[in-house]
Amino acid sequence: MALPPQYSERSVFTGLITDIGELIGHEGGRFAIRSRYAAASIPPGASIACDGCCLSAVTVRADGAGSAFTVDVSNETLSKTTLGSWQVGRDVNLERALRAGDELGGHIVSGHVDGVARILDMRPDGESLRVLLELPLHLAPYVAPKGSVALDGTSLTVNEVAGTRFGVNLIPVTLTQTTWGRKKP
């Protein structure tokens, strides 16, 4: 199926979360998510990053002041992400695909997830929250101090790296406008 001309087959994102959606259902590989995005703004085939994973809207309907949309998730995606463990009611970081002329305030994020990091520790650090994570060994060479990472779709700067462990800081706005404020080690 060809996508509408305003969408390319290679969508990119910024890692700046624009909504926190809610998983309202899933059956097999089809997931349904409620969002504040207007239904009319999401044509079938539109790319939406769901916790950083680029997924294509299959069906879209109005839902209150926002929308509910479905996405199909492949076995490959389930093997590289946390989507297989999602339960109804779960909050999901959402971001629409970047369009020409949009502000690029985070960093270029492909939405192609390479693996899952594990939260080891979270502790206050001034006005921010310091998070220590561990990633799979095969990804360690790609994480560098002061480099960018996307975690649950959120663009973050790496503070330090030690082997497979790395740290980031979450500022207050990130904690309130993403799902990061609800996470625990």
Label each PLM-derived region with a short phrase.
Residues 2-185:
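Conserved loop->alpha-helix
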